[in-house]
Amino acid sequence: MPRFSCYEVRSEFPELERGIVYLDNAASTLKPRRVVEAMREFSYRSYANVHRGVHRLSMEASKAYEDAHEVVARLVGGSWDEVVFTRNTTEAMQLAALTLAYNGLLRGGEVLVTAADHHSTLLPWVRAARLGGGRARILPLDGRGVPRWDLLEDYITEDTRAVAVGHVSNVTGVVAPVEDIVKAAKKVGALVVLDSAQGVPHLPVDFRRMGVDMAAFSGHKMLGPTGIGVLWARRDLLEELEPPLGGGGTVSRVRLQGGSVEIEWEEPPWKFEAGTPPIIEAVGLAEAANMLMEIGMEHVARHEDELTSHTMKLLEPLYSEGLIRYVGPDKPGERHGIVSITTHLKSPDELGLLLDRRGIAVRTGLHCAHILHDHVDASMGSVWASFYIYNCKEDAERLAEALEEILTTRR
């Protein structure tokens, strides 16, 4: 497959015509024309509720919705019936945590999380562990804000029921050693749940080959629309477990027998998709996934690594002079796609506003990772630049030039 060009794909993104350097991709990516057009065409010509009727429109909509499961499965590995559509990564992680707690799989044990995790990973599993009568155990961080993966064997014990961690940190860009995590967890029979919100959009993944049991990610972080996320889970787990949420679409039959309600659940994934699902959004997500597969996730990952390295090289003078500090590793090869900095000269929000005046969009704040920022003495937050397929080297150069101007100009 020929290598893709960031310059060629930029025409798919009208917002870039405004001259904006968009470096807030870890929060949400821009939407290509083809995704918007696919959703518009479906909305105008084939929309109806799914799995609710035998009329033509419902059948067409149901097929498009089912096909979207197939497309997503091709992107992440596994089969279509291992793909559960949710509202976003946060809801997917809540669903995973509640499902395990509801079915007693966390009872009296521990769930291992890390102090670097996004709140959408940390909070659901802390609460689920409590619901199960157990506790969450926290893997500590090193001085850079990176989990102490070298302590995995000490923190995963016979009491560990699940390990729930971020695939790629949304602050440091550090990629978790999934193979090591799975190996340690399987020794004690613990389940591995991956928050891949920053993984699936940026790296080649095959969850089945990776050996994880569940994984979550969002459409809006990978060229798709808001309002749709994915919980991927092993088919045998989905078959075995009872869903914590019930309602329309989750059951094949409900009967009243002797004063009690008997429930026959649908097959996976439907028994975990309660209520009317995100139908139009599923069409958009499928189109986004197709676009990424056409480009090739290996190319996406390599492109982002090159931009990360180029950016940190350009920022080296500011770093060596002590004008900026990295949150996370200060070596490009140890972080992927995200460069987070702080400076004693400006607050994160002030720096973000000054960059915005120069046409550069970055993210400022605590990035839903308060504990990590507290740990690295950045309680006011940080400023991140995060890259995607439509960012080119010129974007990194504009960022570096703007930061130099802002941080070295005396007022």
UniProtKB/Swiss-Prot annotation:
Q: Which CDD domains match?
A: SufS_like
Q: What is its EC number?
A: 2.8.1.7
Q: Which UniProt keywords apply?
A: Pyridoxal phosphate, Transferase
Q: Which GO terms describe its biological process?
A: cysteine metabolic process
Q: Which Gene3D superfamilies match?
A: Aspartate Aminotransferase, domain 1, Type I PLP-dependent aspartate aminotransferase-like (Major domain)
MF (Gene Ontology): cysteine desulfurase activity; pyridoxal phosphate binding
Q: Which Pfam families match?
A: Aminotran_5 (PF00266)
Q: PROSITE patterns per the record? A: AA_TRANSFER_CLASS_5
Residues the record lists as N6-(pyridoxal phosphate)lysine modifications: 221
Name the coenzymes or cofactors required: pyridoxal 5'-phosphate
Q: Which reaction does it catalyse?
A: (sulfur carrier)-H + L-cysteine = (sulfur carrier)-SH + L-alanine
Tree of life domain? Archaea
Family listed: Belongs to the class-V pyridoxal-phosphate-dependent aminotransferase family. Csd subfamily.
Q: What is this protein called?
A: Probable cysteine desulfurase
